[in-house]
Amino acid sequence: MPISDFQVVIGLEVHAQLLTASKIFCGCSTAFGGAPNAHTCPVCLGLPGALPALNRSVVEMAVRTGLALGCEIRPKSVFARKNYFYPDLPKGYQISQYELPICEGGEVTFTLDGRDHTARLVRIHMEEDAGKNVHDVAADGSSGVDLNRAGVPLVEIVSRPDLRSAEEAVEYLKALRAILMALGVNDGNMQEGSLRCDANVSVMRKGASELGTRCEIKNMNSFRFLKQAIEFEARRQVELIEAGEPVVQETRLFDPDRGETRSMRSKEEAHDYRYFPEPDLPPVIVEAALVERLRGELPELPRAKAERYQRSLGLSAQDAGNLVADAAVSAWFDAAVAAYGAGPEAAKKVANWVIGELARLANETGEAPAAWKLTPARLAAVLRLIDAGTIGGPGAKQVVEEVFRTGAEPDAVVKAKGLAQVSDEGAIEAAVDKVLAANPGEVEKYRGGRKNLVGFFVGQVMKEMRGKGNPAVVNALLRRKLGD
C-alpha cells in the first residue's frame, strides 16, 4: 500500500524564547553569544539555597501571546517541577507549568495554496530553558556544558494534532513566528535557537478513526528541516506498518546531514517526569485589569496587516504575506511608503524593491532591517531618481546595492559611478542609427512582421550606450525609425 493511502497527523510544540533583558527567575542577562557560563548565578546554576523570583515581564509577554492567539487567560496558574536528568539541567528538574498553565485553547490560522487553515491550540505555558551541551570543545574531544541559556524564559505553544502535511506544519510555524515577532515577544531567530519546535508525528490509514502511534522529533530550528523531518518520519512509519512491524512510541532526532530521523530515547509520558507543584514559587495571579490593559496594547497582527495591504494598497496576497512575515520588514516598508508617497502605485513600487532586491541583499549580509544602511528615506530618493528619468532599472540596482552596503546618498552614488541615464534625443538617435545600419537583415524581418524583434534592437542600443540610454526614448526613436 503506497504512502498516499495513509494520512500523516502532526502536532507541534513550539518553544519561543521571550525578549526579556533578564532570565525568568533571576537577574542574569539573556544576551546570546557571551563567553560560556558568563551569564550565570546561584539561581540558574541550581546551587543549594538559591531561590527563584519570577520576572513580571515574562508573565505579561505570555498573556500578550495568549490574547493574540485567542486563548483563555487563566486568572490563576501554577509552576511545577518537571523532573529528569540531563547534563545541561543543573537542578535536576526544569521549572515549567503542568496542570494549571497560564493560557488554554486558542488557534493559529495560516494560508496554504490560497486556502485558509486553522490549527487549534491546547495550551501555552511558561518555563525556563535548559543549558546547552557543547561537544568537541577540547583537543581530547571532550564535551562541555554552557549554562548561559539555563533560565532564559520560554513560552511553549502546544497545538492539537490538526496538521495534515509537512507543508501545513511549515506554514503554521511561519504564521506563528510572524505573530510572535509582531508582538515583540520573540525575535524569530531560528538559527540561534530562540524559536525551535518539536513535532509529534503519526500516520493512519485513510478512513481510519483511530490515530496511530506517535513519535516526537526534537528541536528543529528551520522550516526546511521541519519539512524534511516530517516527510522522512511519515515514510518510515508507513514502511514499518507495511512490513507488519509496530511503530514504537519514542523520541527521535533529525539528522540534517543524512536527511533522516534517528532514535534518541523512549518517549516519556507525563508520569515519567513526576510533576509536582514548585514549592519555591507562589501561584501566578493574573488580574482582569492587567489582561484588559494588555489587550488594548496589542499591535496590528500579521493577517490583519496583510488584509489592509491588499485592501488599501492594492498589493497581491503573496506580496502582502511576504511583507508581514517579518514585523521589522513590514515596519520598514511602511516607513518607505510614507517617505516616497501614498497610494497603491507608490506602495507597489516600494514592495517590489523590498521583496526583491532588498531581500536578496539582506539574505547575503544577514542584516536585520534596523541595521540596513539603505534607510526608507534613501530608497524613496532612489525611486524619485527613477521617476525623474535620472537613472534606469539597471542603474537603480547598482545604486541600491551601493547604498545598502555603504550608506552613501543615492545622488552621490549616481555621480560617482556615472550612472546618470542619457535622455538626449541626439545622442540616442546616433546609437539607434548605428544599430539599424549594422543589422539590415533584422530590420527587414521587423518590417516584414517580426515585431518581437524590437526587444533585440532595444538591447543592442542599450549595449551601444553602455546601459545608460533612457528606455522610453530608445523605444520611441526605434519605432519611429522602423516605420511604426
From Swiss-Prot:
GO terms for molecular function: asparaginyl-tRNA synthase (glutamine-hydrolyzing) activity; ATP binding; glutaminyl-tRNA synthase (glutamine-hydrolyzing) activity. The keyword ATP-binding applies. It is an enzyme of class 6 (ligase). The keyword ATP-binding applies. Its EC number is 6.3.5.-. One of its GO terms (biological process) is translation. Gene3D superfamilies: 1.10.10.410, GatB domain, N-terminal subdomain. InterPro entries: Asn/Gln-tRNA_amidoTrfase_suB/E (IPR017959), Asn/Gln-tRNA_Trfase_suB/E_cat (IPR006075), Asn/Gln_amidotransferase (IPR018027), Asn/Gln_tRNA_amidoTrase-B-like (IPR003789), GatB (IPR004413), GatB_C_1 (IPR042114), GatB_Yqey_C_2 (IPR023168), Gln-tRNA_amidoTrfase_suB_CS (IPR017958). Keywords: ATP-binding, Ligase, Nucleotide-binding, Protein biosynthesis. It catalyses: L-glutamyl-tRNA(Gln) + L-glutamine + ATP + H2O = L-glutaminyl-tRNA(Gln) + L-glutamate + ADP + phosphate + H(+); L-aspartyl-tRNA(Asn) + L-glutamine + ATP + H2O = L-asparaginyl-tRNA(Asn) + L-glutamate + ADP + phosphate + 2 H(+). It comes from the Bacteria. SMART domains: GatB_Yqey (SM00845). Belongs to the GatB/GatE family. GatB subfamily. Allows the formation of correctly charged Asn-tRNA(Asn) or Gln-tRNA(Gln) through the transamidation of misacylated Asp-tRNA(Asn) or Glu-tRNA(Gln) in organisms which lack either or both of asparaginyl-tRNA or glutaminyl-tRNA synthetases. The reaction takes place in the presence of glutamine and ATP through an activated phospho-Asp-tRNA(Asn) or phospho-Glu-tRNA(Gln). Heterotrimer of A, B and C subunits. This is Aspartyl/glutamyl-tRNA(Asn/Gln) amidotransferase subunit B. It comes from Anaeromyxobacter dehalogenans (strain 2CP-C).
